[in-house]
């Protein structure tokens, strides 16, 4: 049985936020995880993150901002068409005003707003708010 690296990392971030930590270290890492964190940084949910030694097991240090209420990775990949993204976000997120669903698309890993703009669907990786 393999580890769910992205799910473990997101749970670590949420637990550190609840404890009031300023930063957290994530091990092991993956490129999907760094793309997920890049989207969180662009949207202002984390301050910054640094990837150390990406070619080995590596680690990522994340500087927290105190804005993450919850973030989860889906353990199964759910296919979503471009027209169904809006319905999926309404079901998943608590309100329409904050939070993002992260989707892996042919154009790369995007948040739901960017995927709707580009009119591409894909598989849902997770969400944060």
UniProtKB/Swiss-Prot annotation:
Major subcellular location class: mitochondrion
Pfam families: Ribosomal_S8
InterPro entries: Ribosomal_uS8 (IPR000630), Ribosomal_uS8_CS (IPR047863), Ribosomal_uS8_sf (IPR035987)
Keyword Transmembrane: no
PROSITE patterns: RIBOSOMAL_S8 (PS00053)
Intrachain S-S bonds: none
Subcellular location: Mitochondrion
Any one GO cellular component localisation term in the record: cytosolic small ribosomal subunit
Keywords: Mitochondrion, Ribonucleoprotein, Ribosomal protein
Gene Ontology terms, MF aspect: structural constituent of ribosome
Known partners and oligomeric status: Component of the mitochondrial ribosome small subunit.
Record family assignment: Belongs to the universal ribosomal protein uS8 family.
Name used for this protein in its record: Small ribosomal subunit protein uS8my
Lineage of the species this protein comes from: Eukaryota, Viridiplantae, Streptophyta, Embryophyta, Tracheophyta
Gene for this chain: RPS15AE
